[in-house]
Amino acid sequence: MKERIYPLLFSKNSENFSFNGCNFVVQKAREATARVVMWREFNLINSFTLETTFCGPTDGRYQDCHFTINILKECGRLFCKTLLDYASNEPKVREAIRELETMFPPQKAEEGLSQHFLPNNDDSRK
């Protein structure tokens, strides 16, 4: 479930990115893509393909509008902001993990994402 944290954070930062539109299943036709190879060979979980459509989003403030260069630049800016959040904003990451654990409950309490992704509760960075 770790691979879902960044996309969830990005969807909260950018109204033009849909977490619900994400597909985390590896399809047979995608087996040779760089992101799948990096995941399988090097256990790199944060390798994604970001796709957009010329036609624009189906909801939000840009609904039914074509994406412009400025909208795509804004998307890039928010992508970078989300990288910063992911790397250095522990409260936002904790909130995303709680939300993901609600959306996709772990089988056992000890298998929760926060047990494996976040520092121990006695971590001095609190």
Model-derived segments and spans:
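Structured catalytic-domain cores with a bias toward divalent-metal coordination
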Residues: M1-K126
